[in-house]
From Swiss-Prot:
Belongs to the UPF0213 family. It comes from Shigella dysenteriae serotype 1 (strain Sd197). This is UPF0213 protein YhbQ. Disulfide bonds: none annotated. Residues 2-77 form the GIY-YIG domain. The gene is yhbQ.
Protein backbone atom coordinates (compact mmCIF):
# COMPACT_ATOMS: atom_id res chain seq x y z
CA UNK A 1 0.00 0.00 0.00
CA UNK A 2 1.33 3.43 -0.96
CA UNK A 3 1.65 5.83 1.98
CA UNK A 4 -0.19 9.16 1.85
CA UNK A 5 1.19 12.50 2.98
CA UNK A 6 -0.35 15.71 4.22
CA UNK A 7 1.41 18.88 3.04
CA UNK A 8 1.13 22.65 3.45
CA UNK A 9 2.29 25.11 0.80
CA UNK A 10 2.95 28.76 1.59
CA UNK A 11 1.99 31.32 -1.07
CA UNK A 12 3.78 34.61 -1.77
CA UNK A 13 1.13 36.46 0.26
CA UNK A 14 1.83 34.16 3.26
CA UNK A 15 -1.31 32.02 3.02
CA UNK A 16 -1.15 28.29 3.71
CA UNK A 17 -2.71 25.74 1.37
CA UNK A 18 -3.34 22.22 2.70
CA UNK A 19 -3.43 19.11 0.55
CA UNK A 20 -2.74 15.36 0.43
CA UNK A 21 -0.80 13.21 -2.00
CA UNK A 22 1.20 10.01 -2.37
CA UNK A 23 4.19 11.92 -3.81
CA UNK A 24 4.88 15.30 -2.20
CA UNK A 25 7.63 16.38 -4.62
CA UNK A 26 5.55 15.53 -7.72
CA UNK A 27 2.50 17.34 -6.34
CA UNK A 28 4.57 20.39 -5.33
CA UNK A 29 6.00 20.57 -8.87
CA UNK A 30 2.46 20.39 -10.29
CA UNK A 31 1.45 23.34 -8.11
CA UNK A 32 4.60 25.25 -9.12
CA UNK A 33 3.88 24.73 -12.83
CA UNK A 34 0.24 25.85 -12.51
CA UNK A 35 -1.15 22.35 -13.09
CA UNK A 36 -2.19 21.79 -9.48
CA UNK A 37 -5.09 23.22 -7.51
CA UNK A 38 -6.80 26.30 -8.93
CA UNK A 39 -6.53 27.93 -5.50
CA UNK A 40 -2.76 28.24 -5.99
CA UNK A 41 -2.68 29.51 -9.56
CA UNK A 42 -1.36 33.03 -9.86
CA UNK A 43 -0.36 33.18 -6.19
CA UNK A 44 3.31 33.93 -6.90
CA UNK A 45 6.19 31.99 -5.44
CA UNK A 46 5.17 28.82 -3.61
CA UNK A 47 7.21 27.10 -0.92
CA UNK A 48 6.65 23.71 0.64
CA UNK A 49 6.17 24.60 4.31
CA UNK A 50 5.34 21.21 5.83
CA UNK A 51 4.83 17.58 4.92
CA UNK A 52 4.31 14.43 6.96
CA UNK A 53 3.27 10.84 6.28
CA UNK A 54 -0.23 10.07 7.53
CA UNK A 55 -0.95 6.50 6.48
CA UNK A 56 -3.71 5.44 4.12
CA UNK A 57 -5.95 7.63 1.95
CA UNK A 58 -8.86 7.57 4.39
CA UNK A 59 -6.71 8.84 7.24
CA UNK A 60 -5.10 11.43 4.93
CA UNK A 61 -8.51 12.81 3.96
CA UNK A 62 -9.55 13.08 7.60
CA UNK A 63 -6.25 14.74 8.55
CA UNK A 64 -6.59 17.21 5.66
CA UNK A 65 -10.10 18.13 6.78
CA UNK A 66 -8.98 18.58 10.39
CA UNK A 67 -5.97 20.75 9.44
CA UNK A 68 -8.16 22.91 7.21
CA UNK A 69 -10.31 23.60 10.29
CA UNK A 70 -7.33 24.95 12.24
CA UNK A 71 -6.76 28.67 12.67
CA UNK A 72 -3.87 30.34 10.85
CA UNK A 73 -1.98 30.55 14.17
CA UNK A 74 -2.42 26.81 14.77
CA UNK A 75 -1.26 26.01 11.22
CA UNK A 76 1.80 28.24 11.71
CA UNK A 77 2.61 26.36 14.92
CA UNK A 78 2.27 23.07 13.04
CA UNK A 79 4.65 24.32 10.34
CA UNK A 80 7.19 25.74 12.79
CA UNK A 81 7.22 23.01 15.40
CA UNK A 82 5.08 20.13 14.22
CA UNK A 83 3.15 20.87 17.41
CA UNK A 84 0.03 18.80 17.77
CA UNK A 85 0.40 16.77 14.57
CA UNK A 86 1.04 13.46 16.35
CA UNK A 87 -1.95 14.09 18.60
CA UNK A 88 -4.11 14.99 15.62
CA UNK A 89 -3.20 11.73 13.86
CA UNK A 90 -3.73 9.75 17.04
CA UNK A 91 -7.21 11.20 17.49
CA UNK A 92 -8.10 10.28 13.91
CA UNK A 93 -6.89 6.69 14.33
CA UNK A 94 -8.84 6.07 17.52
CA UNK A 95 -11.93 4.05 16.62
CA UNK A 96 -15.18 5.76 17.48
CA UNK A 97 -17.61 3.65 19.49
CA UNK A 98 -21.19 3.93 18.34
CA UNK A 99 -23.88 3.93 20.96
CA UNK A 100 -27.29 2.50 20.16
Amino acid sequence: MTPWFLYLIRTADNKLYTGITTDVERRYQQHQSGKGAKALRGKGELTLAFSAPVGDRSLALRAEYRVKQLTKRQKERLVAEGTGFAELLSSLQTPKIKSD
